[in-house]
Curated annotation (Swiss-Prot):
It comes from Rhizobium rhizogenes (strain K84 / ATCC BAA-868) (Agrobacterium radiobacter). GO terms for molecular function: RNA binding. InterPro entries: Hfq, LSM_dom_sf, Sm. Residues 10-70 form the Sm domain. One of its GO terms (cellular component) is cytosol. This is RNA-binding protein Hfq.
Length: 80
């Protein structure tokens, strides 16, 4: 069976979702949102903070900043 490739956006969102990394999301209108991604699809991101969920449409997102360092890819050792 062929391996399905995953785009960078899905890889990033799935990593922060699985690791429950807190994010700051800036919208194109300047609004700043913070929370943890609980789910996402092709069109939106479900963000949770203080027991409340917000559905954010991806077309409204400008920037996403993780609250801590994260590793999405396996480390590759540099040959000496």
């Amino acid at each position: 069976m062929a391996e399905r490739s995953q785009n960078l956006q899905d890889l990033f969102l799935n990593t922060v979702r699985k690791q429950k990394i807190s994010l700051t999301i800036f919208l194109i209108n300047g609004v700043k949102l913070t929370g943890v991604v609980t789910s996402f699809d092709n069109f939106c991101v479900l963000l949770r903070r203080d027991g409340h969920s917000q559905l954010v449409y991806k077309h409204a997102i400008s920037t996403i900043m993780p609250g801590q360092p994260m590793q999405m890819f396996e480390s590759e050792e540099v040959a000496s």
